[in-house]
From Swiss-Prot:
Originating species: Pelotomaculum thermopropionicum (strain DSM 13744 / JCM 10971 / SI)
A GO CC term attached to the entry: cytoplasm
Pathway: Amino-acid biosynthesis; L-histidine biosynthesis; L-histidine from 5-phospho-alpha-D-ribose 1-diphosphate: step 3/9
Name of the protein described by the UniProt record: Phosphoribosyl-AMP cyclohydrolase
Assigned keywords, A-Z: Amino-acid biosynthesis, Cytoplasm, Histidine biosynthesis, Hydrolase, Magnesium, Metal-binding, Zinc
Necessary cofactors: Mg(2+); Zn(2+)
Length: 129
């Protein structure tokens, strides 16, 4: 039975949060936003597409870095307001060069520990920002 993408509960900007998870390990890689068209592109191509709120443009994950995400499964929650995209991650997911965007651990004493190691140098991939 076909799913009506309009039945998802997009926010006032027409976006829905998309949590991206490594399909093999279960690690949470990142969170970004999709609009209806980004979700359509994701389903059609089998790779993740998102909507950049700051640039007001589509972005294909890995387009610049080559670190693409091959979609294995897309799930939505019971409220229909959040997506879970399970992927096979190629390279690092984070634009800071880490495998996961969740590489800052907030300690109980309020300090921050960086977990994981950089897999690439962002300046070499993206240039100076």
């Amino acid at each position: 039975m076909p799913f009506d993408l309009d039945s998802l509960k997009y926010n006032e900007a027409g976006l829905v949060p998309a949590i991206v998870q490594d399909a093999g390990t279960g690690a949470v890689l990142m969170m970004a936003y999709m609009n209806r068209e980004a979700l359509e592109k994701t389903l059609a191509t089998g790779e993740t597409w998102f909507w950049s709120r700051s640039r007001k443009a589509f972005w294909h994950k890995g387009e610049t870095s080559g670190n693409v995400q091959r979609v294995k499964e897309v799930l939505y929650d019971c409220d229909r307001d959040t997506l879970l995209v399970k992927v096979e991650q190629h390279g690092a997911a984070c634009h800071e060069g880490y495998y996961s965007c969740f590489h800052y651990r907030l300690e109980r004493d309020g300090s921050v520990t960086v977990v994981g190691e950089k897999q690439f140098d962002p300046e070499q991939v993206y240039g100076k920002r």
